[in-house]
């Protein structure tokens, strides 16, 4: 289930990215305006289309990840254990979780070709500081996938802090496995587990 959630989330989160800052564009309009940019880039570059992991990872780093609030995502994924973590542990958790998502999203991006995204209109007021943008991914030969993603308004603009695929939260799914690891081996154990997983993924390149 988690793999399916991450794969589906990758498309929507990728399609939100552009050189236009979140502060200048409403969240739903940002998604609507830039739908297809990443898919176009993949189709136009034979290396990307062939699944070149390094190039796809670079694409994700440049076009997608600047628009995530990784600190908030990590805090939500770690849950109640976050308050028990030291500053150094929090920094390590954010770094390792970010690396995990970078590589997971990069792998998933290489699988997208002909999907389309329908972005539902959002009623946004001037005082809103967090919103949920609802979208539907249509995939040839497959069932449409409803995706809601939570965004918050920060001084630097709108950023993503959670994604719900067919009602299931990406952050909540990670929280379950993170809590299991922390119960068994503590926060340092979770950091090591994430670090080991990232090292293993890196070795597969």
Please name every model-derived segment.
Residues 8-18:
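Bacterial N-terminal signal peptides
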Residues 19-23:
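Sec/Tat signal peptide C-region and signal peptidase I cleavage site
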Residues 25-105:
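Early exported N-terminus immediately downstream of N-terminal targeting peptides
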Residues 144-172:
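Short beta-strand edge/turn micro-motifs at domain boundaries
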Residues 162-205:
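Low-complexity, intrinsically disordered terminal/linker segments enriched in charged
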């Amino acid at each position: 289930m988690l793999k399916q959630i991450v794969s589906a989330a990758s498309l929507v989160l990728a399609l939100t990215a552009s050189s236009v800052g979140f502060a200048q564009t409403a969240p739903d309009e940002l998604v609507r305006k830039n739908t297809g940019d990443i898919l176009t880039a993949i189709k136009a570059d034979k290396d990307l289309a062939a699944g070149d992991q390094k190039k796809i990872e670079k694409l994700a780093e440049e076009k997608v990840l600047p628009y995530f609030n990784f600190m908030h995502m990590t805090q939500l994924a770690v849950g109640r254990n976050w308050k028990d973590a030291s500053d150094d542990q929090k920094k390590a958790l954010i770094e390792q979780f970010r690396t995990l998502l970078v590589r997971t999203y990069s792998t998933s991006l290489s699988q997208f070709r002909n999907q389309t995204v329908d972005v539902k209109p959002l009623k946004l007021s001037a005082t809103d500081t967090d919103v949920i943008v609802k979208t539907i991914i249509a995939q040839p030969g497959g069932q449409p996938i409803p995706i809601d993603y939570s965004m918050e308004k920060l001084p630097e603009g709108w950023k993503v802090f959670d994604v719900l695929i067919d009602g299931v939260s990406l952050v909540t799914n990670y929280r379950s496995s993170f809590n299991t690891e922390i119960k068994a081996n503590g926060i340092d154990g979770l950091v090591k587990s994430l670090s080991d997983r990232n090292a293993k993924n890196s070795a597969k390149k």
